[in-house]
Amino acid sequence: MGKVLIIDDEKQILSLLSRIIGLEGYEVFQAANCKVGIKQLEQNDPEVVLCDVCLPDGSGVELVSELKRLRPLSEVILLTAHGNIPDGVQAIKNGAFDYITKGDDNNKILPLIAKAMEKATVAYSQQ
């Protein structure tokens, strides 16, 4: 069905999102920081990346540029505990597919992943 990489330093969030996304039939990979996230991206080539904004070794907003440079056809969705309009705008400028707040948008995660997956799948098929 597709591959999703989750980059988040909160173990509970990683576990919860992995379970929810995995139950939808996606193959899920996890990373707790930017460095491991980049390694997972290169090794597993996911169509969609969910990335926390605040990571122990960097900013998810800045990481979007690196992820898109390495895998331009993969779609990145940023997650944050606190909605921040300037971060959201910068994330989109850096190439993010979307930017959502954790908790408030739990019911939006799966439809958003499905839309991002569809866009990435079409892009990969036209490559």
Q: What is each residue range found by the language model?
A:
Residues 8, 52, 80:
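Active-site residues of response regulator receiver
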Residues 44-50, 55:
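Active-site beta3 strand of CheY-like receiver
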Residues 39, 54, 61-72, 90:
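Short amphipathic alpha-helix used as the core "switch/output" element in two-component signaling
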Residues 2, 11-29:
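Two-component/phosphorelay signaling modules centered on CheY-like receiver
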Residues 32-33, 59-62:
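Acidic catalytic/metal-coordinating carboxylates
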Residues 14, 56, 80, 84:
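The feature encodes the CheY-like receiver
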Residues 25-34, 40:
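Short hydrophobic/Thr-rich beta-strand motif most characteristic of the beta2 strand and flanking loop
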